[in-house]
């Protein structure tokens, strides 16, 4: 529903058309859905898809986010074709942060109701040719999991990227995204470096300082985010902390036990190392 601009650090509405409107005590949130987005099979994306997705998660405890969703959301209802109302179990002011993207992703990826509602069990459904709202569809993939090829939709202007447009995404009006994007598993460190140096790949992730320096000594076209140390932004926005599974019984469901763990930690030392 909400994406993240990682440069500004601000959320923006993607499938949603706004940042949601709460009632006075934040126990209800009304969300407008952006009109004009089409699934890759041509169907309109609307409130039915959003309501179905959240209720699917709530009703299937095999889905990882089910317990957390039921902890805060009481019900999700369709108001009209492009409006959804969320009723919370308690005051919940951080609604968009919890149910949108704030770091790397979200547990609440809207799925096509007209596809998933036809499945006997959504938790075992192998969606190998997914119908998507984004600009790329799966063109082909390796059954061993070594690579996957994505192709730009012919109607990408009706995808989330095209409909949201340059208001939030950084591209010019006359710019067309790459026709294909190929994600590959490149093997060990030596293989990864060789393929980067020989220009067989465009982007390489999770590179050590030593690997970067070795590759740059063989190919002067290889660059990082910055030309000088630290070469990339070192601030990791991921949360760091202990999470207790309270559903597993003693001793984790005992508040005194959890407080004892917290009080035993050297917070100053943790801050230095984390």
Regions found by a protein language model. Name each.
Residues 5-7, 102-180, 190-191:
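Gly/Pro-rich hinge or "lid" segments in bacterial periplasmic/extracellular proteins
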Residues 14-17, 43, 94-107, 241-245, ...:
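A structural "hinge/loop" feature
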Residues 46-53, 81-87, 134-135, 175-180, ...:
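Alpha-helical secondary-structure segments
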Residues 57, 75, 139-151, 182-249, ...:
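Extracellular/periplasmic solute-recognition and catalytic clefts
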